[in-house]
Regions:
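Short helix/loop capping segments that flank catalytic or ligand/cofactor-binding pockets
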Residues: 23, 113-115, 197-199
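Short coil/turn connectors at secondary-structure junctions
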Residues: 6-11, 32-38, 57, 69-73, ...
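Phosphate/diphosphate-binding loops
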Residues: 79-80, 101, 245-247
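Thiamine diphosphate
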Residues: 1-64, 68, 74-95, 164-253
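Conformationally flexible catalytic loops at phosphate/diphosphate-handling active centers
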Residues: 99-178
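Glycine-rich beta-alpha junction loops
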Residues: 44-46, 106-113, 192-194, 245
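Structural motif
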Residues: 14-15, 40, 105, 189, ...
Length: 253
């Protein structure tokens, strides 16, 4: 993936939880080299070998520390099979726009579902990548893709520039879905397959007269803090629903 991305191709890799851990070093190298690429994690139980049941326990890994060093990457969380396809298309666009790895964080429940899917139309043209190592036989200066910087000043400068780009992503790329949220006194926050169960629970609670709504983060990084802040105007409580021991709750707080 690193090599294909360096040459300007759209490239992706996929695995499930422990396999993503093994890819962590390479993902860090891609981030350090400002290389676009897509990583798909269909999560299963852990830590260690864990189990093959669905899980959402890689939230921290995806949003905090997929690999070593100072970097983030956009993380998309689909909740349907259709959205899994849509998120992959979106991930490639984000990767190219911001020159960064992007993760699609699904789970084993979604990974084993069968639902109708309408694939988006293929793009007729892709963004130009003048930085890529495409080989022009002396027609231009050599392009170098690298994550090694031996002077502290050079590394610091690049990290500062990268984090300025992250602030642009935080400002422009927060995505979420609101369901029965306008007057909700209790806001359920759930992503991925958990949000499907939460949505049914919200409908049942409404039938009982309970003012509850669902906020579904679609981007886990950047987390949709603006949507959380908007809900604070009427919410009395937030309930974080996730297939783990409580990882997203840190961001909800």
């Amino acid at each position: 993936v690193y090599g294909a991305a360096s040459a300007g191709a759209r490239a992706m890799t996929s695995s499930s939880s422990p396999g993503i851990s093994l890819k962590g070093e390479g993902i860090s190298y891609m981030a350090g080299s400002d290389l676009p690429g897509v990583i798909i994690n269909v999560q299963r139980g852990g830590p260690g070998l864990g189990g093959i049941q669905p899980s959402q326990s890689d939230y921290w890994q995806a949003t905090r520390a997929t690999g070593h060093g100072d970097f983030f990457m956009p993380v998309l969380a689909p909740s349907t099979v259709q959205e899994m396809a849509d998120c992959v298309y979106r991930a490639f666009d984000l990767a190219d726009e911001y020159r960064t790895p992007v993760m699609v964080l699904a789970d084993g429940m979604l990974g084993q579902m069968m639902e109708p899917v309408v694939l988006p139309e293929p793009k007729e043209s892709l963004p130009e990548k003048p930085w890529a190592t495409t080989g022009h036989k002396g027609k231009r200066a050599h392009n170098i893709v690298n994550s090694l910087y031996l002077t502290a000043d050079a590394l610091e400068k690049l990290n500062i520039e990268r984090f300025e780009r992250y602030e642009v992503i935080r400002e422009n790329e927060q995505r979420s879905e609101a369901f029965m949220l306008d007057d909700a006194e209790i806001v359920v926050v759930a992503f991925g397959a958990s949000s499907r169960v939460a949505r049914s629970a919200v409908v049942a609670a409404r039938e009982e007269g309970i003012k509850v709504g669902l906020l579904r983060p679609i981007t886990l990084w950047p987390f949709p803090t603006k949507a959380i802040e908007d809900a604070l105007s009427h919410a009395k409580a937030f309930l974080s629903v996730e297939m783990n021991m409580g990882q997203m709750v840190d961001d909800v707080r």
